[in-house]
Amino acid sequence: MTADDYGRTLPFFTVNLLVSDLARSIAFYTNVIGATLTYSDPDFAALRLRELEFMLHADHTYDHHPWFQSLTSGVRRGLGAELRLFHTDPDALEARARKHGATILQECKDMPHGWRDVIVADPDGYTWAIGSATKPIT
């Protein structure tokens, strides 16, 4: 599929993360988060996680963008945004994160908002909260 054909297939909402090492990020998202890689080249990767289609772009693809200097300065990325996955076993995800050496920001625990979650960071510092309901919704 060409890039412009792919762009026309995107849903109403999707996520695009700019990453410093595309291969390392693909490994994190497939091995730890459980996404399926649907396409990749040296600049770009498309992944699917259930209904979510999301993208990774290598930093160098933004070399003419106003963000480029900030991207390559080593500043932590994604600060202030938390991506959440619900209906996902947080204990199993934490085990995969440990197995693959991923950064665990918060170990699994039951939260006051009604779900058990784990919080992990991808290799570039993007934060993911993954969990499931602690009891059935009534």
Predicted ranges, named:
Residues 1-16, 36-88, 92-121, 132-138:
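Vicinal oxygen chelate
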Residues 18, 23-38:
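N-terminal first-folded block
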Residues 25-30, 97, 122-125:
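Conserved active-site tyrosine of GNAT-family acetyltransferases
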Residues 127-130:
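Short glycine-/small-residue motifs
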